[in-house]
Curated annotation (Swiss-Prot):
Gene that this sequence comes from: rimO
Keywords: 4Fe-4S, Cytoplasm, Iron, Iron-sulfur, Metal-binding, S-adenosyl-L-methionine, Transferase
Species in which this protein is naturally found: Heliobacterium modesticaldum (strain ATCC 51547 / Ice1)
Organismal lineage: Bacteria, Bacillati, Bacillota, Clostridia, Eubacteriales
Function per UniProt: Catalyzes the methylthiolation of an aspartic acid residue of ribosomal protein uS12.
Keyword Cell membrane: no
Subcellular location(s) per record: Cytoplasm
InterPro entries in the record: Elp3/MiaA/NifB-like_rSAM (IPR006638), Methylthiotransferase (IPR005839), Methylthiotransferase_N (IPR013848), Methylthiotransferase_N_sf (IPR038135), NA-bd_OB-fold (IPR012340), Ribosomal_uS12_MeSTrfase_RimO (IPR005840), rSAM (IPR007197), rSAM_horseshoe (IPR023404)
Cofactor(s) needed by this chain: [4Fe-4S] cluster
Single Gene Ontology MF annotation: metal ion binding
Enzyme class: transferase
Co-factor remark: Binds 2 [4Fe-4S] clusters. One cluster is coordinated with 3 cysteines and an exchangeable S-adenosyl-L-methionine.
This protein's name: Ribosomal protein uS12 methylthiotransferase RimO
The family this protein is said to belong to: Belongs to the methylthiotransferase family. RimO subfamily.
Length: 460
């Protein structure tokens, strides 16, 4: 008899372990929420499974940031719902940002879903599952004010050698195009002690790289301590024995302090890499979108970062087709790309979102114009990226080994590549283990990846 450990009419009944499969969509911040839910469910006695067809409970943690993410979430829900007809599935639950913004509409349109809950309801996941298994449909979405800490169980879904550490949640920036403050709530920082304790625990479990994430990582501490405290946090994390790399993701340009730049320059464990979403290069558009850093300020910041951090790899992102973007303003973006020569760039077409200031503007750009500008920007950046990649030919990089793709052929990353969003380094070598380090001489380059050969073979 299939079953689980769950509450039934006020009693706790132990039945054969019930299996749960969780699908996580969207950003790394959402992924951490998924990992916390996995920890809570496993602690409550459920068995986690990677096979949807074996699961008695299916849960999808959705993204609701832009239209393509919403469409992917809906499609995933519909695909999982089929297992209620063909598999063991007894319950389908939908979590995350999509129900936070659209729970009522979703409940009406998706009767096959047994529960909807938001990011603020993560701590209640076990009770929500129990309610559903008792036959009660759960449609209550709470305030998005949850903030996990080091005391909560967490099951890592990343490879054993790296993990995301969410140092804050929510956002107070209120960019004109973005619905995140409505979906994730106000900005709120974890305590330094909690972050350090969690990171130390992760290192004890084998991770060598901690990726610091938040909606606005550089704003860390301002709500809790009354000042920006990312520089101090870096110093404390760097003191953890066994931690090799600290990587900064989702850095807001106007919140970079001189102290942070100096901390990055002084601490060898901080990767010479920064993720710095800039969104556009026209001052009028930046102001209309409530971005607080102008183009000249951004230029100064990038020059300072490159001066203080030689070899720095900069990842950024831009939005084409923002309301009011004329051909002249778009050309400023192209000129800026050519001038600044960023290592890695994500180009996105503007997605008109409900309940955002930009979504209410009249001067929307036609979809075909957005697509045409997207392709022009991508072609330019690909040329820039290839040129930068080719500059590494003949040089040696320290590489974290992540995969053996064939006998004698390995794949990994240097400090210049973040997992999942950037390329990789493929190299020839012998007897390498996942999670080990290799010095690799670069012999070839493509737009996104590097190729090479190990020069420090074991036993030589």
């Amino acid at each position: 008899m299939d079953g689980a450990l769950f509450l039934l009419r006020g009693r706790t009944e132990a039945i054969l372990t019930m299996k749960i499969h969780i699908t996580s969509l969207g950003c790394a911040k959402n992924r951490v929420d998924t990992e916390v839910m996995m920890g809570l469910l496993r602690e409550a006695g459920y068995e986690l499974t990677q096979r949807e067809e074996d699961a008695h409970v299916l849960l999808v943690n959705t993204c609701g940031f832009i239209l393509p993410a919403k469409e992917e979430s809906i499609q995933t829900i519909l695909e999982l719902a089929r297992y209620k007809e063909t598999g063991r599935c007894r319950a389908l639950l939908v979590a995350g940002c999509l129900p936070q913004g659209y729970a009522g509409e979703l409940a009406a349109e998706l009767p096959e879903v047994d529960a909807f809950f938001g990011p603020g309801d993560v701590p209640r996941v076990t009770s929500i599952v129990a309610e559903v298994l008792r036959g009660k449909r759960s449609l209550e979405v709470g305030k998005p004010d949850f903030l996990y800490d080091h005391t909560m169980p967490r099951v890592l879904s990343t490879p054993f050698h790296y993990a995301y550490v969410k140092i804050a949640d929510g956002c107070d920036n209120r960019c004109g195009y973005c619905a995140i403050p409505n979906l994730r709530g106000r900005f709120r920082s974890r305590s330094e002690e909690s972050i350090v304790e969690e990171t130390r625990s992760l290192v004890d479990r084998g991770i060598q790289e901690a990726l610091l994430i938040a909606q606005d990582t550089t704003c860390y501490g301002v709500d809790r301590y009354g000042e920006f405290r990312l520089a101090q946090l870096i110093g404390k994390l760097a003191s953890i024995d066994g931690l090799r790399w600290i990587r900064l993701m989702y850095c807001y340009p106007s919140h970079f302090t001189p102290e942070l730049i100096e901390a990055m320059a002084a601490e060898p464990k901080v990767c010479r890499y920064v993720d710095l979403p800039l969104q556009h290069a026209d001052d009028e558009l930046l102001r209309s979108m409530n971005r607080h850093a102008g183009v000249d300020e951004i230029r100064r910041l990038i020059r300072t970062l490159r001066e203080r951090l030689p070899g720095l790899a900069i990842r950024t992102s831009f939005i084409v087709g923002l309301p009011g973007e004329t051909e002249e303003k778009f050309q400023r973006l192209l000129d800026f790309l050519a001038e600044m020569r960023f290592d890695r760039v994500g180009i996105f077409t503007y997605s008109r979102e409900e309940n955002t200031p930009a979504g209410k503007l009249a001067d929307q750009v036609p979809e075909e114009v957005k697509e045409e500008r997207y392709h022009r920007a991508m072609v330019l950046q690909q040329e820039i990226s290839l040129s930068i990649q080719q500059e590494w030919i003949g040089k040696t990089l320290e590489v974290l080994v992540e995969e053996e793709v064939a006998p004698g052929l390995y794949r990994g990353r240097s400090e210049r590549e973040a997992p999942e969003v950037d390329g990789h380094i493929e190299f020839k070598g012998r007897h390498r283990m996942i999670g080990e380090w290799a010095n690799v001489r670069i012999t070839a380059a493509s737009h996104y990846d590097l190729m090479g050969e190990a020069i420090d073979e074991p036993g030589e």
